[in-house]
Swiss-Prot record:
Function recorded in the entry: Probably involved in DNA replication. Binds the origin of replication (ori).
Gene Ontology MF term list: ATP binding; DNA replication origin binding
Organism taxonomic ancestry: Viruses, Duplodnaviria, Heunggongvirae, Peploviricota, Herviviricetes
Domain Helicase ATP-binding: from-to ranges: 39-195
Originating organism: Human herpesvirus 7 (strain JI) (HHV-7)
Keyword Nucleotide-binding: yes
UniProt-recorded name of the protein: Replication origin-binding protein
Residues of the signal peptide: none
UniProt family annotation: Belongs to the herpesviridae OriBP family.
Domain of life: Viruses
GO annotation, biological process: DNA replication
TM spans (from-to): none
Keyword entries, A-Z: ATP-binding, DNA replication, DNA-binding, Nucleotide-binding
Length: 787
């Protein structure tokens, strides 16, 4: 069924927009509530699944239901966030439900309370079953299973399934419940009756609102910042949601400069967790990120309008999280939401495809059929992810929704369309550049083009704090260095002895014996970047695969050494981080598949490694590699790197024209040859997996040696090989000129090379798997001091 979804139904299916049209198992009854707020305490079915928009009274209905539960029955409430769990406890106490405990206030490792509120990641601490099981914001709970903070996926998955199968009543609520949630409970509890309650009632606080998508940030009649300044100039208060910390900092600095007299509150992860929103009433401008989400609501009539700055970036909050966060302000006097999407960081290659198409009323059948191929291809690749998710039934069951949420972040039209659907489902009128959604396709094309052409990058914020610029090399080369307990000191500069030990361990495990200690330190410093950590792990595993080490041995080494290896954040070793701290990729199987694919590509291209910058790559080799590996490359690009690309055999000139119009990009030609497509997907793989750029290059006359570095003797040898007379050529300059002219006359095919950091040149081929016991002894701090 999953592979037969029509293109325009994909988002509707996975975000619950078409529940009334679905057919369910015989034990499922469907109820529609359209004239009142949510209520379900009188329903007799053991499983109650509630789909209701924001502001429809889901939590109030839950409280009324809990009041009907016998005091002797045990109740477990599972939340998606710690702050949400705490807010639920407060709401319960205000409504005389005083016998609930909050998991974070229980010191014991194992929890056995009769009535408990717990965040899903701590579910493994629960030691008993419960009569009544509540899953509030169930889609957000499911989303946590894909988070890197979920360190005990297998245990939590097993515990949740056990709790479901042993409960006598279940309540699951969310604004985007889909048919797969209903099917999930039907499969888990086939002997229970289920009530699917679809509530479409929306309070006036939301239904009276209008959302305006702004095409530009500064210039134009509907410029995002222009409207924001106008509101503040009239003495109104505004609330601004920013999807990233970078965009929040940018807007905060901009507003402080333009409105120095306004009271501004900035809430991001830098300021810590947000536990309350009551103080917002004291500010003219409140700027917040997704740290303010479900469980926190501002109910005072204080702000005139809501502004939303969405900085599309891989790893950022998905559109559902954005939608939930922007709904935290329940009342605005002008009933207006202004939204700006900045796609500056996702201007991806031409071959990247949209997953779905927006609800434009004038698509042709031919255009729909083109994007239907994209939709089916997306589903097919998502299904292949089952190989990586064997430790969790929940991750397996809901994987397509997860990949939709992550992949849309890298595609402007998908993000725009999905957010429009979510707003529309909450009865918020959506306007795109003056037109009411759904709009004509030409309007959609024009709008995305304006967003792409007008987007801007952020300048990196400079800090006034100046760090000590001394390096480890300068410290140990200075004769005035002293030892003070566990520290080496030079003035105010300190290095803990454990820092040197960590360098030693790092080399012993991963690097060649002859790598200089100060080069090792440079490598370790770069690993503070998450991208560099990912590249380093990929380079490690590819080297091990190339050496022919047994796969199970590599997996064991990954789990025991790579995954657990810690690196110091600073010289004094006050903080550490994990080498394997990588967003998105949490499965060893994924990394191993990347490594095997990388090794195959390396062999096809005759490279020394996947970060080899010295070897020329012929276009013929790239074409052959793409022909052999295209299906696996495209699968890995989607599943591991959440970048959706179709198979090149399905492309034609009109397909590419349509895709790129949707993305707001303009092609000089309407065609993309197989050669160009092949280069494109190989380039994308190297960039995603190894942060290396595949670029066109002039052929190197001697492999590994640039033209400017050739000696006179080497040039003479090349001229002789090419049968070029050098009778009258005496000087080095004359010889170089003759070589250049001769090269132009020779018929040469296109040549490419990799640009970037050749990290593989430092990596040991076997790690510590087959190293001698004395490896790395030269890295001791004593040796450093003696040198």
């Amino acid at each position: 069924m999953e592979t037969q979804l029509q293109n325009d139904q994909l988002f509707l299916e996975w975000f619950g927009q078409n529940l009334l049209d679905c057919h369910f198992a015989q034990n499922v009854s469907v109820y529609l509530q359209d004239a009142s707020m949510v209520h379900f305490k009188t329903f007799s079915e053991q499983i109650k699944i509630i789909r209701a928009p924001m502001g429809s009274g889901k939590t109030s209905a839950l409280i009324e239901f809990l009041k009907t539960v016998s005091y002797i029955d045990s109740v477990l409430v599972i939340s998606c966030r710690k702050t949400f769990a705490a807010e639920l406890l407060n709401r319960f106490k205000k409504n005389d439900l005083n016998d609930f405990y909050l998991y974070s206030e229980i010191k014991e490792r194992q929890i056995n309370k009769n009535k408990l509120i717990i965040q899903v990641e701590s579910l493994h601490r629960v030691t008993r079953n419960y009569h009544v099981l509540i899953l509030d914001e169930i889609m957000s709970i499911i989303k946590q299973f894909y988070s890197k903070t979920m360190t005990k996926v297998k245990e939590v998955d097993a515990k949740l399934l056990t709790l479901i199968r042993n409960s006598t009543q279940i309540v699951a609520m969310d604004a985007t419940v889909n048919r797969y949630v209903v099917d999930f409970f039907s499969l888990c509890m086939p002997h229970f009756k289920s009530a699917l309650i679809i509530n479409t009632f929306v309070s006036a606080n939301f239904s009276n609102r209008s959302a305006y998508f702004c095409p530009t940030f500064i210039d134009g009649n509907l410029a995002f910042y222009g409207i924001l300044k106008q509101k503040l100039g009239l003495g109104k208060n505004i609330c601004l949601f920013c999807s990233t910390v970078t965009s929040a900092d940018f807007m905060s600095e901009l507003l402080k400069t333009d409105f120095p007299d306004k009271k501004i509150l900035l809430l991001t992860s830098k300021q810590g967790k947000c536990h309350s929103v009551e103080s917002w009433i004291n500010y003219n401008i409140v700027i917040y990120t997704s740290i303010v989400t479900v469980g926190l609501s501002f109910d005072f009539l204080h702000f005139s309008a809501m502004f939303v700055y969405i900085h599309l970036v891989k790893g950022g909050p998905d559109m559902v999280s954005v939608f939930q966060s922007m709904g935290r302000v329940r009342k605005v006097t002008d009933n207006e939401i202004f939204i700006y999407l900045n796609p500056a960081l996702i201007q991806v290659p031409l071959s990247v495809s949209p997953i779905s198409i927006p609800q434009c009323y004038d698509w042709t059948l031919f255009e729909k059929s083109i994007l239907q191929c994209s939709c089916m291809d997306f589903n097919k690749k998502c299904l292949s992810a089952q190989n990586y998710l064997s430790n969790s039934m929940i991750k397996q069951f809901f994987r397509i929704r997860h990949y939709i949420e992550k992949t849309t972040l890298l595609n402007l039209p998908d993000s725009l369309y999905l957010l429009c659907l979510l707003l529309d489902s909450n009865s918020i009128k959506v306007h795109i550049d003056g037109d009411v959604f759904p709009i004509a396709k030409e309007k959609f094309y024009a709008f995305t083009k304006m967003l792409v052409q007008g987007c801007h990058f952020f300048e990196k914020k400079k800090t006034d704090f100046v760090e000590n610029t001394m390096t480890l090399k300068e410290l140990f080369s200075n004769t005035n260095i002293t030892v003070n307990g566990e520290f080496y000191e030079l003035g105010n500069f300190q290095v803990h002895k454990d820092y040197i030990v960590n360098l030693n361990n790092f080399q012993n495990l991963f690097l060649k014996n002859d790598v200089d200690i100060f080069v090792i330190e440079e490598i370790m410093l770069t690993l503070k970047s998450e991208i560099r950590r990912f590249v380093f792990i990929n380079a490690l595993l590819q080297k091990y695969v190339a050496t022919g080490i047994d796969v199970e041995k590599i997996k064991a080494f990954f789990k025991s050494r790579i995954k657990t290896f810690t690196l110091p954040e600073n010289y004094i070793c006050s903080k550490f981080y994990l080498l394997s701290d990588i967003s998105g990729v949490h499965e060893c199987g994924m990394l191993m598949d990347v490594a095997f694919l990388a090794e195959s590509i390396r062999a096809d291209l005759n490279l020394q490694s996947c970060t080899d910058t010295q070897t020329d790559i012929s276009e013929d080799a790239i074409l052959l590699c793409a022909a052999r590996r295209s299906s696996e490359i495209l699968r890995i690009l989607q599943i591991v790197f959440t970048t959706h690309v179709q198979l090149f055999e399905k492309y034609n000139s009109y397909t590419l024209y349509l895709f790129n119009r949707l993305k707001g990009m303009q092609l000089n030609t309407w065609s993309l040859s197989i050669a160009k497509f092949s280069v494109s997907i190989i380039r994308m793989f190297f960039k995603c997996a190894f942060n290396m750029n595949l670029v066109k290059s002039k052929p190197r006359y001697i492999v590994g040696k640039p033209f400017r570095s050739l000696t006179k003797r080497e040039i003479e040898t090349l001229l002789d090989m090419w049968h070029v007379s050098r009778t009258n050529l005496k000087t080095y300059k004359e010889l170089r000129k003759a070589l250049t002219e001769a090269s132009k006359k020779r018929q040469r095919k296109k040549i490419y090379k990799l640009l970037g950091h050749n990290i593989s040149s430092y990596i040991s081929e076997t790690g510590c798997l087959f190293q001698h016991a004395d490896a790395g002894m030269c890295l001791s701090s004593g040796c450093l001091l003696r040198s």
